[in-house]
Amino acid sequence: MIRPILACQDPYEAGRAFQSAGWTLDFSQPPESGDPLVGVSLYGSALLLGVTEGYVSEVELPFLGCGVVLYLTVPDAALEAIHESHRAFRPAEIKTQPWGDRAFEVTVAGWRLMIAGNSPEE
């Protein structure tokens, strides 16, 4: 299993953005803990939202997430509802990809996601 830690200028704000799109808030370390980290998930795909401090220089901040697309799968039957729950982030239309998956792309908290439906046998 892989759980990426995404560098965010404010992990708590990023967590709220993901929550507003229907993601589950798994945990949120208190800001005073010294370890500002937030965990979110969507149908078993989990992300950790961390800080940029110590990981991303000031000059790199405008390029946060550049060139990265996180691909996650959700049940086919839920894809349209998940697309709708991301409406505030202006998701692309759901399309059948050249490899056969139905998916859409959306950017949440500066991170680009491709969310695809999968059939139960996958």
Language-model regions: role of each:
Residues 7-47:
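Core segments of cupin and vicinal oxygen chelate
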Residues 26, 34, 54-60:
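A short, acidic/glycine-rich surface segment
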Residues 32, 53, 119-120:
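A generic structural motif
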Residues 16-20, 81-87:
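Short amphipathic alpha-helices in soluble, non-transmembrane regions
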Residues 1-10, 38-41, 57-122:
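Vicinal oxygen chelate
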Residues 28-30, 67, 95:
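Short beta-strand
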